[in-house]
UniProtKB/Swiss-Prot annotation:
<comment type="similarity">
    <text>Belongs to the complex I 49 kDa subunit family.</text>
</comment>
<comment type="function">
    <text>NDH-1 shuttles electrons from NADH, via FMN and iron-sulfur (Fe-S) centers, to quinones in the respiratory chain. The immediate electron acceptor for the enzyme in this species is believed to be ubiquinone. Couples the redox reaction to proton translocation (for every two electrons transferred, four hydrogen ions are translocated across the cytoplasmic membrane), and thus conserves the redox energy in a proton gradient.</text>
</comment>
<dbReference type="InterPro" id="IPR029014">
    <property type="entry name" value="NiFe-Hase_large"/>
</dbReference>
<keyword id="KW-1278">Translocase</keyword>
<dbReference type="InterPro" id="IPR001135">
    <property type="entry name" value="NADH_Q_OxRdtase_suD"/>
</dbReference>
<dbReference type="GO" id="GO:0051287">
    <property type="term" value="F:NAD binding"/>
</dbReference>
<dbReference type="GO" id="GO:0048038">
    <property type="term" value="F:quinone binding"/>
</dbReference>
<dbReference type="Pfam" id="PF00346">
    <property type="entry name" value="Complex1_49kDa"/>
</dbReference>
<keyword id="KW-0472">Membrane</keyword>
<keyword id="KW-0830">Ubiquinone</keyword>
<keyword id="KW-0874">Quinone</keyword>
<dbReference type="InterPro" id="IPR014029">
    <property type="entry name" value="NADH_UbQ_OxRdtase_49kDa_CS"/>
</dbReference>
<dbReference type="GO" id="GO:0005886">
    <property type="term" value="C:plasma membrane"/>
</dbReference>
<dbReference type="InterPro" id="IPR022885">
    <property type="entry name" value="NDH1_su_D/H"/>
</dbReference>
<protein>
    <recommendedName>
        <fullName>NADH-quinone oxidoreductase subunit D</fullName>
        <ecNumber>7.1.1.-</ecNumber>
    </recommendedName>
</protein>
<keyword id="KW-0997">Cell inner membrane</keyword>
<keyword id="KW-1003">Cell membrane</keyword>
Amino acid sequence: MADIRNYTMNFGPQHPAAHGVLRLVMELDGEVIRRADPHIGLLHRATEKLAENKTYIQSVPYMDRLDYVSMMVNEHAYVMAIEKLLQIDVPIRAQYIRVMFDEITRILNHLLWLGAHALDVGAMTVFLYTFREREDLMDCYEAVSGARLHAAYYRPGGVYRDLPDSMPQYRSSAIHDEKTTTARNENRQGSLLDFIEDFTHRFPGYVDDYETLLTDNRIWKQRLVDIGVVSPDRAKALGFSGPMLRGSGVAWDLRKKQPYEVYDQVDFDIPVGVNGDCYDRYLVRIEEMRQSNYIIKQCIDWMRKNPGPVITSNFKVAPPPRLSMKQNMEEMIHHFKLFTEGMHVPRGEVYAAVEHPKGEFGIYIISDGANMPYRLKIRAPGFAHLAAMDEMARGHMIADLVAIIGTQDIVFGEIDR
């Protein structure tokens, strides 16, 4: 009798379900996966090395391009690390703005994850719905920073500027007549806070729509239940964090366990799974969107009652106001020095981590007292999750691999760095 031999197959890096440039070398027994070996590095851009040759402020835009779905949260970890080295305090209003935009970014990330995950598994409608909601949140990014994607809005010592008092308006065109344009501008007549508040009232209904389509859907459950099961102990041993860890039943969230900014001032719950499978991780992320919406509402209420500065008044760290800079020679010098030479950060080393939509995103900086980092290390949550791909996929069918890749919420910008 002839020996039964496994055969090897490549999955990606051009596969539509590979979520970027993932290449998996799979060993198959028929259609059953015996081994899945991830090959990474196809999106490596040497971000850590580039940061060693840029001033601290010049590296902020690089952070947006790591996980390019969760832009402002990447910036948050980076500026927090710099602030720890400088030992400066961030104005309380800036902290609330950061928390609010962290949660807007979390919803942005989870909406893209849900749409892409559902599309991979075969449910196309959800993808169209989630991108409708993402459009409103992208407009919030654009209102504060001028960019829909790579915002560079967080700065050491605070944020670039306060929230605007008006929203950009749609204009009528050959495609959209005046009546349609008026309807689209209906919720854009007030400030950015008014626009976000209107979104928070509408959003729970949208999440209900997603759940109506998916949560009790027989085919959705057949594709996700008991797929990619990871026990709590294995999840901790593998270095999981974020929804991947909470989906396995471990209630670990940096916003609660190691609170930063004003997370200890807002109320929210940590959703956790029971079985540690793809379906539990789906439920955890769905509930996280509801909790993020609740946090945003609390931030809006606080900011309406408490105006104030949004960046430190230390001109060695943050530029002086534009008007005074053009009227005062000393402030002009501060501005010139900051944007040419950059600020000199005290000697030392520091690690700052935030609860990223994908897990614990950390920045480790070693400073030698110069105006550039001596060494910058990025702790990407997706790296540990992708390393567990072999263990999660073993014994499953090829079709189940697509669900496992989706549940890991892989973005190669942060994994390859």
